[in-house]
Amino acid sequence: MLYSEDDKRKQESYRIPLFGSEEESTSIPKYVLKKEPMEPRIAYQLVKDQLMDEGNARQNLATFCQTYMEKEAEILMAETLEKNAIDKSEYPQTAELENRCVNILADLWNAPKDMSYLGTSTVGSSEACMLGGLAMKFRWRNNAEKRGLDIQAKRPNLIISSGYQVCWEKFCVYWDVDMRVVPMDKNHLSLDVDKVFDLVDEYTIGVVGILGITYTGKFDDIQLLDEKVEAYNETNEHQLVIHIDGASGAMFTPFVNPELPWDFRLKNVVSINTSGHKYGLVYPGVGWILWKDKEYLPKELIFEVSYLGGSMPTMAINFSRSASQIIGQYYNFLRYGFEGYREIHEKTKKTAIYLAKTVEKSGYFEIINDGANLPIVCYKMKEGLDVEWTLYDLADQLLMKGWQVPAYPLPADLSDTIIQRFVCRADLGYNVAEEFAADFADAIHNLEHARVLYHDKERNDSYGFTH
C-alpha cells in the first residue's frame, strides 16, 4: 500500500506527546465544525482545558443541585446513559425502577391508601411544576364548564407568593394563565395566607404552596393554607386545590421533620413536585411529580404512545432522555434507605446551623433563615451598621477563595433589601464548613482593613435560580 506524506504525518502524530501535537500548537475552530478528526486523547484534553477556569462545583454554595455521588452510583449511571427513559417497552425493568421510585415517594408523602395516586419522573422540578399547573388548569376548565361558567370571559389565574421560582412565571406565560402574586413583606417572608383570598375568584385554578422558597429557604404555612382553603370550599361551588412546589423541601422534610403536616395528609393538597437532584442526592437532572388521586390528573393530559414497540401512557412534557438519573435515584433509595437519608440530612442541617451561628457571631448580620427547617443560611446586613463594604463586596472576597455565595435583592415589595444566601448540601461536611467559616472571617477582615474600597451604589449583576 502506498502512503502519502499526509498519511505519514498522521501516523507520526500518534507518537507525538499530547502538548507537542499540532492541535495544541494551532487555534482550533470554535464556532464552526473543524474539517478533520483528531485523536480522542487530544479532544479530551482540549475540552478539559476549556473548562479549567470554571469554579469548583463543590464550592458553589449558590446551587441546590447535587455535586457529589458515590463511585458506585456514578458507574451505574455511566453504564445506563444509552437507555431512553421514554422507551418503556424496550427497557421494562428501567420502567419498573421508575415505578418503584414513584411508590417510594408516595409513601414518604403520605398518599392515602384508599386513593389511586400516580406520578412520573421529569427532567427536573421545572417540568414537574409545568405538569402540576397544567393538571390544575385542565381540571378547573372541566369543572367550570360543568358549572356553566363562561371560560372565555377572562383568563384563568394562579395564586402564589412573590418568592416563586421562575418556572411558575414561565408556566403562566406559556399557557395563558394570569399569575396573581401575594407580595412578601418584612412581616411575611413566605406566603401571607390571609391575603390569598383577596385574589381568589371563580377563575382561580389553584394555589401554590412553596416548601423551601428559593430566595430564603423559608416554608409557606401549608397547614394554615389548607385550613383556609377548606373553609372556602365549604361555602363555594368553585373548589380550590393546592399544589406543593417541594423542589427543595419535599425530599428533606420527610426525613428530618416527619411530623410537619404539609403533604397528602392535608385534604386539599392534590399534587406535589420535587427535585431528585437536590435533596434527593442525584446529579442533575431528575424531578418527580405525584398526584394524590387520578381524578386530579385529567385524562386529556395522558397520551398513549405506540410507535416504540408497545402501547404506553406518558404524561411528561419532555420525551427522549437518558434513564441514568432515574436509575441513580433508585440506587440512592436502595443504598440509603430511610435512616441513611435521615442521617445525611440531619448532618447537613447541623452544618447549616453551625454556619448560621458563625455568621451571626460576626456581629455584622441579621439572620433571616438559620437552616433549622431547610439547610439554607440567609442573612442581611444589620441596619445602622457603619461599614464601607456591602454584601456584594463580601461575595467578591469569598469568590477569591473559590466560594460562590450570591448576594441579591429580595423580590417585589422587598427589592430594596439585599440578602446573601448559601446552600448547605450533603457534600458540605463539617470540616469543609470550618474552612468556609475561616474564609468567611478572613473576607470580612480584609474588607474592614482595605485601604481602598470602591464599588457602585447598585450592583448590576443578575442572579438566576433554576430547579
UniProtKB/Swiss-Prot annotation:
Its EC number is 4.1.1.15. The keyword Lyase applies. GO terms for cellular component: cytosol. Its cofactor is pyridoxal 5'-phosphate. Keywords: Decarboxylase, Lyase, Pyridoxal phosphate. This is Probable glutamate decarboxylase gamma. The keyword Hydrolase does not apply. It holds the Pfam family Pyridoxal_deC. SUPFAM superfamilies: PLP-dependent transferases (SSF53383). The modification N6-(pyridoxal phosphate)lysine is found at residue 278. NCBIfam families: Glu-decarb-GAD (TIGR01788). It comes from the Bacteria. GO terms for biological process: glutamate catabolic process. One of its GO terms (molecular function) is pyridoxal phosphate binding. It catalyses: L-glutamate + H(+) = 4-aminobutanoate + CO2. PANTHER family: GLUTAMATE DECARBOXYLASE. The lineage of its organism: Bacteria, Bacillati, Bacillota, Bacilli, Bacillales. Belongs to the group II decarboxylase family.
